[in-house]
């Protein structure tokens, strides 16, 4: 049953109907559409469109329909309704007869779909935050277990300074914490109710929109009807957050892929998140991480698509806006699946502590310590930087680490070097000296882990 038709003398062509109908994807808004309809029925009582008895009858029927939807949401797809609003109204009329036709009084599908998608987005934010927090907890637990795993830190994919695997884990805790807080910010901005805005100019019935907003779990009603039915900022914002978080996940996945490579051999991924080759029997491929990395472009594509859809739309509602749903549904599903998979990857991750330490001892990652040592002896940093650079070249030519050079060799480049240089060139010294807040010193990392455990408890 179409919710329009009196204006038309011919039925819609089947080709147009197939092109126009959205039930195949907006069926996912069934629960929210029913929830909004119950709220609207209560608002109509207060403006004398419905009696209390009629409202109770409608609410009972809608709750029955809600139970049916929750038991088998896919059954909706067997219907030929235009969209989820048409489907809900049709099923309601089947249950209560002509009374069901009164529910849409003063309401447009424009404000109806606007409230549906906001209700859905609010629910998804809560679910996504729990998944993100769970990933953070797993990262913190992994960090706690790997505080002694010294490894190279990298810039430009070149060994730079020693860090610990725990410090690496806690870096991603911080990234995902920003994603979590962005979701909170987005939730607060979208927590306004557009229902009662009508098609664009507001409803002709003196509905108490603030009371309606509170009934539906919103903080307050939107302030402008024209904006209310045109607004899809919350979708763009969630797609933006999802895209940025997927970029974080992709970096996590890329690090894991590199660490898992035969050349690095820092970690071993569980058999449960890897696959083999149909030709090469020795292969153990990091498919979970590669798929996380690959799906990032898919989510970013949804953001780009939505921005392009919105950029040229005049006020107020346009059918183009129907294109908001498939992108947001797919992007948030993909994001949550990737967050959960990253959590699973961490579950049985093995860190090769001996190998990470061996790698940290190579690559002259203690060169900065030598430069700081010279500074402590009164050498200006810019000069010490140049001196250490020359020393590294010499060590490379001799096939030695800095810690393996003799004092006479050091003094070819600076006379201030003494026997105390060897202590500061050790990996432990490199870590211990980074004791400012946020640094890699074991004390600071332990503090960060303890603080995060308390925060995420």
From Swiss-Prot:
CDD domains: Argininosuccinate_lyase. It comes from the Bacteria. Its EC number is 4.3.2.1. Disulfide bonds: none annotated. Its main location: cytoplasm. It catalyses: 2-(N(omega)-L-arginino)succinate = fumarate + L-arginine. Pathway: Amino-acid biosynthesis; L-arginine biosynthesis; L-arginine from L-ornithine and carbamoyl phosphate: step 3/3. Keywords: Amino-acid biosynthesis, Arginine biosynthesis, Cytoplasm, Lyase. The keyword Lyase applies. GO terms for biological process: arginine biosynthetic process via ornithine; L-arginine biosynthetic process. GO terms for molecular function: argininosuccinate lyase activity. It is found in: Cytoplasm. One of its GO terms (cellular component) is cytosol. Belongs to the lyase 1 family. Argininosuccinate lyase subfamily. This is Argininosuccinate lyase. It comes from Haemophilus influenzae (strain PittEE). The lineage of its organism: Bacteria, Pseudomonadati, Pseudomonadota, Gammaproteobacteria, Pasteurellales.
